[in-house]
Amino acid sequence: MEKKYILYFLFLLPFFMILVIAETEEENPDDLIQLTVTRNKIMTAQYECYQKIMQDPIQQTEGIYCNRTWDGWLCWNDVAAGTESMQHCPDYFQDFDPSEKVTKICDQDGNWFRHPESNRTWTNYTQCNINTHEKVQTALNLFYLTIIGHGLSIASLLISLGIFFYFKSLSCQRITLHKNLFFSFVCNSIVTIIHLTAVANNQALVATNPVSCKVFQFIHLYLMGCNYFWMLCEGIYLHTLIVVAVFAEKQHLMWYYFLGWGFPLIPACIHAVARRLYYNDNCWISSDTHLLYIIHGPICAALLVNLFFLLNIVRVLITKLKVTHQAESNLYMKAVRATLILVPLLGIEFVLIPWRPEGKIAEEVYDYIMHILVHYQGLLVSTIYCFFNGEVQAILRRNWNQYKIQFGNSFSHSDALRSASYTVSTISDGAGYSHDYPSEHLNGKSIHDMENIVIKPEKLYD
């Protein structure tokens, strides 16, 4: 019997092992995917290193030097004796910071440094993850800051669009441009949230590299371009209205639609073709390629044009204020106010702060400032151009007052009806059931008249 049970156990053991392995894979699919990605990166780097070692010319300079080598993670060139070679940390592991440095020492004898404990050649990777915890915390803070910013932007922009569409008296060309700009902000915010939560952080999706992932990246880049080109449309409209022709007739909005929604398709399509041919990485998610300038170049050009429009508009405003002979302080305050209102709409802050500073604290401050400027721009624009708009405030105030008056009248009317009905009902009940009344007439009306009044109480107000 025992032998029989042992045979059953041996027969079922492989199935139990399969179940355990499958359960482990279901519990930690991301770990297995990350391990596969890391292994592929290391194998690719190793292959490229050996190719480089064989193809590079032999060192011709005199003197002692350490030979080129592969240390298991990185490739090292020939180095003169007594020097220290340095390069950036690899991105194989999640806790490695590619901005930190790896060092490898070549001693005076032309041998790579050996660790005293293991007596093996050793490369110093200790700096790669020394500040990982702090940087991960900063990255998480920026991630949550981004999600909250886009969420608030979507909510405020949808409310603004609802106001613009509901109140027909606000309809004009300027509001039409605002509607399209706000809608582009909404689309861009929604796609950005999906990209950050469902694509960028989904290693399984990136590893499988479906076509839908690349299509989504194409849509993401296209909508980002639409966002900035609708900013350009706002700048062109304001410049035409204030500088070119103040008393001109209505402008043709068809060209604005083409520029805002149509033109961004051109760089987006060119980038997609170039990415497919020259840098076809998974989901086109990598930013380590100059092909992104196909998208960023037109955006920077649009922002520079908007910067010119802004400066010219401020110049015209200052000139007009000087003609009115107002006080100097008031003149500059109005010019500054106009500038501060235009800056968030036209996106000039990306031109004013284009360079990332060096230094840990400076970089962190820069990241927070840029994340606020970029991801809260929809909230800022909707606040300034809708909620702080005098016309919008006047219409909302007028409708709110009308609603309060109507609600108050309705409430007072219903209270009066209930009070009158209660009074008349009491009188009717007394007349019908009391034997103490000297006459069947009350207040000049008969009991039958009172019954009619109870049935039709609105007659009290005739």
From Swiss-Prot:
GO cellular component: plasma membrane
Disulphide connectivity of cysteines: C49-C75, C66-C106, C89-C128
Chain positions of site Required for RAMP2 interaction: T289
Transmembrane segments: 141-165, 177-199, 211-239, 254-274, 291-315, 331-352, 368-388
Keywords: Cell membrane, Disulfide bond, G-protein coupled receptor, Glycoprotein, Membrane, Phosphoprotein, Receptor, Signal, Transducer, Transmembrane, Transmembrane helix
Localization of this protein: Cell membrane
Membrane topology: Multi-pass membrane protein
Required for RAMP3 interaction, annotated site positions: Q251
Region described as Required for RAMP3 interaction: 289-290
PROSITE patterns associated with the record: G_PROTEIN_RECEP_F2_1 (PS00649), G_PROTEIN_RECEP_F2_2 (PS00650), G_PROTEIN_RECEP_F2_3 (PS50227), G_PROTEIN_RECEP_F2_4 (PS50261)
Required for ADM2 interaction (site feature) positions: S287, H296, W355
Primary localisation category: membrane
Site (Required for ADM interaction): residue numbering on this chain: Q203
Keyword Disulfide bond attributed: yes
Gene Ontology molecular function: adrenomedullin receptor activity; calcitonin gene-related peptide receptor activity; calcitonin receptor activity
Stretches in topological domain Extracellular: 23-140, 200-210, 275-290, 353-367
Signal sequence coordinates: 1-22
InterPro entries: GPCR_2, GPCR_2-like_7TM, GPCR_2_calcitonin_rcpt_fam, GPCR_2_CGRP1_rcpt, GPCR_2_extracell_dom_sf, GPCR_2_extracellular_dom, GPCR_2_secretin-like, GPCR_2_secretin-like_CS
Glycosylation sites noted in the Swiss-Prot or TrEMBL record: N67, N119, N124
GO terms of biological process kind: adenylate cyclase-activating G protein-coupled receptor signaling pathway; adrenomedullin receptor signaling pathway; angiogenesis; calcitonin gene-related peptide receptor signaling pathway; cell surface receptor signaling pathway
Keyword Secreted annotated: no
Tissue distribution of the protein: Detected in lung and coronary artery.
Family named by the database record: Belongs to the G-protein coupled receptor 2 family.
Protein name: Calcitonin gene-related peptide type 1 receptor
Originating organism: Sus scrofa (Pig)
High-level lineage: Eukaryota, Metazoa, Chordata, Craniata, Vertebrata
